[in-house]
Amino acid sequence: MNSAEKAMQSFLESLGLDLEQEHMEKTPQRVATLFAELFSGRNQRTQDVWGEVFPTDYQGLVAVEKIPFYSMCEHHLMPFFGTVDVIYQPHEGRVAGLSKVSDLVNVLARRPQLQE
């Protein structure tokens, strides 16, 4: 059991939850794994997301709309979710693949942040 799992076990026990019950015995591990995933963007660099960019002659704006996201509010660790529209102008005749914009949103959303 790692330190996050031990801390979660201690927290749940301090609330009076019986972790010996059949459906609760692995809850500290599951919750620690969940939070590791929810905060995984902290360990990722946004510049690593872009990967290959493509040449383009297009001069206008590029829009990727209604990208779903979920994140965690850093005040109370409550989840929030929604959609985001990203609009950007290609720089120096290069454009990112549309999936990379969605990937970038996911990296940024997987960081604790204010939801206000």
Segments and roles (model prediction):
Residues 1-116:
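N-terminal intrinsically disordered, cationic/polar leader segments
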